[in-house]
């Protein structure tokens, strides 16, 4: 049988691409409002130090307000896409069941709720961080970077408008920040949306993996999972090792169903099912199950799988 979850893998790539555009758009909308505030400072380079402080504090507040809006949008975008990813895996599972002739209904609503909850609350990360703490923690770091840019520009005796233009460039998601930028403002990010995009990609990928495992862990026709690297030219050593090493005596890259490691941040690896039976054997097992005949242990396993899909 071909890759059972090829459909949801394709959907994951599309969700990630669409999500990237959604987050970029949120930053661009914020930039438009920030630019309005910056334009109001045109011609105000030659003001007293006290007035410079007043203008810059107002601009900083305007920027922070817009970034708060962006972060709120980003949090909602990620939540929505985690849920969408879980729904696509549920749909893929339903397609697979129909293909093998198993009349089992997948409770996509329950699966979606479970996956979204486990990821955004940090349960899947052993409580080390949550979606909200990640986003708003980065919000504080970004504000510190803004403060450092202002402080450095003041040390260079720049005027209000020139400082404002530097801040405008900092929050521009399409601005190119070269080596000179890093030299002028060490420690400030080159891409304003990088951390948000990284977090979003990571959580959608983890939603895919969690939904994949939840919907197959008790499938009696699947014996293990095989790790498949993304195939890009930037595959990390960890993923290469996971794909090529025989850690459990099952073959290179093959993991027991309860031992599949969580993909690392920004990862785009996928997983394939290792089948315990061929198509003909699966068909016979399902027929026996419908008729209440054949292997009782297998029938009990199919019962459990079907019930799990209904009651995630």
Model regions and ranges:
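N-terminal leader/targeting and assembly helices and adjacent pre-domain segments
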Residues: 1-184, 277-312
């Amino acid at each position: 049988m071909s890759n059972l979850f090829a459909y949801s893998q394709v959907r994951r790539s599309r969700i990630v691409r669409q999500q990237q555009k959604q987050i970029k758009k949120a930053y661009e909308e914020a930039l438009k409002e920030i630019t309005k505030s910056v334009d109001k400072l045109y011609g105000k380079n030659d003001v007293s130090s006290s007035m410079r402080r007043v203008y810059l504090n107002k601009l900083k507040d305007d920027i922070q307000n817009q970034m708060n809006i962006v972060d709120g949008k980003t949090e909602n975008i990620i939540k929505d896409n985690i849920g969408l990813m879980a729904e696509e895996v549920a749909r893929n599972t339903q397609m697979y069941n129909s293909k093998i002739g198993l009349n089992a209904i997948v409770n996509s609503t329950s699966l979606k709720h479970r996956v979204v909850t486990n990821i955004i609350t940090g349960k899947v990360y052993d409580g080390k961080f949550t979606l909200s703490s990640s986003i708003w923690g980065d919000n504080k770091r970004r504000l510190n970077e803004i403060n450092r840019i202002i402080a450095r520009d003041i040390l260079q005796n720049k005027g209000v408008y020139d400082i404002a233009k530097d801040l405008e460039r900092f929050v521009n998601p399409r601005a190119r920040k070269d080596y000179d930028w890093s030299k002028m403002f060490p420690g400030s990010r080159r891409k304003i949306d990088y951390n948000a995009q990284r977090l979003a990609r990571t959580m959608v990928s983890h939603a895919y993996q969690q939904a994949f495992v939840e919907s197959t862990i008790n499938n009696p026709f699947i014996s293990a999972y095989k790790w498949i690297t993304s195939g890009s030219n930037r595959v990390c050593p960890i993923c290469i090792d996971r794909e090529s090493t025989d850690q459990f005596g099952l073959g290179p890259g093959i993991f027991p169903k309860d031992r599949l490691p969580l993909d690392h941040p920004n990862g785009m690896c996928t997983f394939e099912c290792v089948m315990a039976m061929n198509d003909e054997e699966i068909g016979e097992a399902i027929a026996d199950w419908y008729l209440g005949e054949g292997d009782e242990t297998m029938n009990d396993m199919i019962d459990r799988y079907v019930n799990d899909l209904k009651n995630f």
